[in-house]
Amino acid sequence: MTTPTSVRERAVPAPAGRRPERGARWRRVGLRLVALVVLLALWQLVIVLQLWSPVLVPSPAAVWRALLETSGTHDGVRGYQGHTLIEHLGISLRRIFIGAGAGVVAGLVVGVLMGTLPWVRVVLEPAVAFLRTLPPLAYFSLLIIWFGIDEAPKLWLLAIAAMPPVAVATASAVASAPTALVEAARAIGAGRGQVVTSVVLPSALPEILIGVRFAFGIAYSSVVAAETVNGLPGIGGLIRDAQRYNQSDTVILGLFAIGISGLLIDAGLRVLSDRLAPWRRHA
């Protein structure tokens, strides 16, 4: 006679279910590695065939040498302009996390208010839409006039650039919260604040995190452009300074540093999204 325990044991397909997932993950990794190798091969082929001047398109080896030179001390010179590549990148990331972090918090507050209070949406939606359509560098000059050329205008730029996408995503997600869940929470005596924190925000979390990912992407592109003004140390300042002296290998190295760190930040936000909202996987 079959016992309930044996039926349950045979009904557990977890190990078999995980194998296809792992296989698909490794296939994606393999395809990306192949694509990377192909791109490097094409890059080297351009150099071998001398399709462009090495001054304009440096070889992978030249970029590698630039990495070594900017990562340590060579001929008595430390890194680039006294700072190593990782220090330049770290300073830019610090600006992003402080400035964009403030913008994300502001966007969450504005978005929740817009999504829960119709009159707030009527008042604030045009202003948020106006800021959203402005290129961040369009008001950077005004921020320099107001705050000078040090850190303050850069941080304000990042905060203002990061706020609109989070506010729009949050407002839309909060307004679309399941009515049945909201009414059920109110029926058991939950106040407005409890409904927002216990029902509305958890249901809106996936869309909010998508807005946060967009905000950090906008902030990254904005800080690199902002660092062209008194941006040393900083990865944008490094690129701008190297461009002045036609150091294309250092410029490309800086671009790689930006791209790789940006991918890592986005991957981290995606993992955080999957952890906080496992019921909704992002493509």
Please provide the spans of the model-predicted regions.
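Generic hydrophobic transmembrane alpha-helix motif, especially the helices
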Residues: A129-P165, S172-A173
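Transmembrane alpha-helices
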Residues: W156, I160, R192-A226, D249, ...
